[in-house]
Amino acid sequence: MEIIPAIDMQGGRCVRLYQGDFQRVTVYDDDPVAVAHRWVAQGAPRLHLVDLDGARSGHPVHTDIIRAIVQSVDAPVQLGGGLRSIAAVERALELGVQRVILGTAAVHDPELIRQLVQQFGDAIAIAVDARNDMAATAGWTETAAISAIDLVERMAALGVRRVIYTDIARDGTLSEPNIATTRALVRPGGPAIIASGGISTIDHLRRLAEVGVEGAIVGRALYTGDLSLSDALAAVQ
């Protein structure tokens, strides 16, 4: 199971939101590039970048920072936030991003997802962000009329091979991940699942590994020091 540090960007800084609320933001560093270097130096096998301003505006905003990270770290990067067109996905991949993550488009434009999967295959991942088990879109500001489980099934039918599942109510809270829903999403022959939201202890990581997820994205716990990256990596070796 991969341990993937999250770098969420807002206004050019590295931040964390509480339950996806843009009014409840904590700034952890003014230099996301330096943060990326720090996590990779500590052994991160991959970085999870989120362009929060992009998620709200519908188009990528932190392109220069993303480019600087991709070009200077020795680890693959996955990127989400504001990627809602073929052109936006192509630009992200041209920057050197290994994997692009789409969320809003998965709900509102499944035909786009089908086209992207056909064209880019494994480079496409889907973010299934859930509030009260229903999918959320537009930077988590809107709730759609489809459940997280149904959305994953719909994406699997389109050929999607990887899903990042986040329980918004737990994100940034240091509480615990939603093990029950995560377990329901991990199915033989289904998309690989990467878990996110509320992961803050070694026990959380071990429970997720037992469920069978491909990876775990860790954010606030790494920044507060509640969880060290070296301990997390060692726990799942």
Swiss-Prot record:
GO terms for cellular component: cytoplasm. GO terms for biological process: L-histidine biosynthetic process; L-tryptophan biosynthetic process. SUPFAM superfamilies: Ribulose-phoshate binding barrel (SSF51366). It catalyses: 1-(5-phospho-beta-D-ribosyl)-5-[(5-phospho-beta-D-ribosylamino)methylideneamino]imidazole-4-carboxamide = 5-[(5-phospho-1-deoxy-D-ribulos-1-ylimino)methylamino]-1-(5-phospho-beta-D-ribosyl)imidazole-4-carboxamide. Its EC number is 5.3.1.16. Pathway: Amino-acid biosynthesis; L-histidine biosynthesis; L-histidine from 5-phospho-alpha-D-ribose 1-diphosphate: step 4/9. Keywords: Amino-acid biosynthesis, Cytoplasm, Histidine biosynthesis, Isomerase. Gene3D superfamilies: Aldolase class I. It comes from the Bacteria. CDD domains: HisA (cd04732). The keyword DNA-binding does not apply. One of its GO terms (molecular function) is 1-(5-phosphoribosyl)-5-[(5-phosphoribosylamino)methylideneamino]imidazole-4-carboxamide isomerase activity. It is an enzyme of class 5 (isomerase). InterPro entries: Aldolase_TIM, His_biosynth, HisA_bact_arch, Isoase_HisA-like, Isoase_HisA-like_bact, RibuloseP-bd_barrel. It is found in: Cytoplasm. The keyword Cytoplasm applies. The active site is at D8, D129. Belongs to the HisA/HisF family. HAMAP family: HisA. This is 1-(5-phosphoribosyl)-5-[(5-phosphoribosylamino)methylideneamino] imidazole-4-carboxamide isomerase. It comes from Roseiflexus sp. (strain RS-1). The gene is hisA.
